[in-house]
Swiss-Prot record:
This is Uncharacterized protein UU148. It comes from the Bacteria.
Length: 113
């Protein structure tokens, strides 16, 4: 969980430095990720356990938003720093969820008509 917190802090620092250079959609997604992360760690600081604070739902929310941003960033020219932070955050979240909740990530593919 410390690694997740570390990368959320890096994402917040990146956002503060480069928010003017981000598209509005990417900026909104990053703000949502930061807000959910803050809620998770506020809950933990109040002494709640992982199950009591229902951490898996916000972590899955963050994970999905990261995937969305990464898909957008791979199609555009953007700073490699942001991609690195998001990929590391994605990796640590998935490792944490798998280790603590025995959750199996399945790749969801969109059906093209």
């Amino acid at each position: 969980m410390d690694k997740i917190k570390n990368y959320l802090e890096k994402l917040q620092a990146f956002y503060k430095l480069y928010s003017l250079n981000l598209t509005q959609g990417t900026e909104i997604l990053i703000i949502q990720i930061i807000d959910k992360g803050n809620l998770i760690f506020d809950s933990i600081e109040k002494g709640k356990t992982f199950n009591e604070s229902k951490i898996i739902e916000p972590l899955l929310f963050i994970f999905k938003k990261i995937n969305t941003i990464l898909a957008i960033l791979k199609l555009t020219f953007t700073k490699d720093d942001l991609i690195g932070i998001l990929q590391s955050l994605e990796e640590h979240i998935s490792e944490f969820i798998i280790a603590n909740y025995k959750y199996d990530f399945e790749i969801e593919e969109d059906d093209e008509d």
